[in-house]
């Protein structure tokens, strides 16, 4: 029997596609037409705004796709044993496209795209970049990321896809590895935001929840020596940000606990 993503249970009931007008720092009902013409240069202007709050039950039908940063959603509350996590250590989009074997949070190994494509989520969260920025050019990373997002759109037609910002690192890590310096990460996030919205996907500015006033990973969220990965407190803050930055839909309405749709 083949191994699958770490999950709580099989899910279904995909909602109809929806796409909002996205505005920075504004809590309002959001709508947007697909395939938008994107001209904003600041990713915050393209991000999903605050929009009430959903309960953690929302995560039972969510799928997280990414690298070891996304693996934390399988390890820590409130998403552990709730969300489905298809995240693989030291992974970049080109490896997923080529169906390389990846290492899951529990240490087992599986062909990555084969693992992802059999899922039936109601919402998808995608995050790549930390490994790719170190191992390849920015242009190559963005091209492969674009191709992967197209592949996800085709496979999961009608399912809302949230493309998350690359998360901040510590200032010290940025000195050690210049591609992961937060000023550079912000530039790449601007490109990712444009890419996502131009494809009719949603852009989630996780930096807003995880960065300090200087744009570095908050000290109380740092979880490992590498200045990249986070502790349970950081993941709890990240998950809370997701629950307060979702797009309204008839499907999501069942999880609303406060806000304009409560």
Task: Report residues per predicted region.
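Short, small-residue-biased leader/transition segments that mark boundaries at the very start
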Residues: 2-6
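Sec-exported extracytoplasmic/periplasmic mature domains
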Residues: 74, 129, 146, 150-157, ...
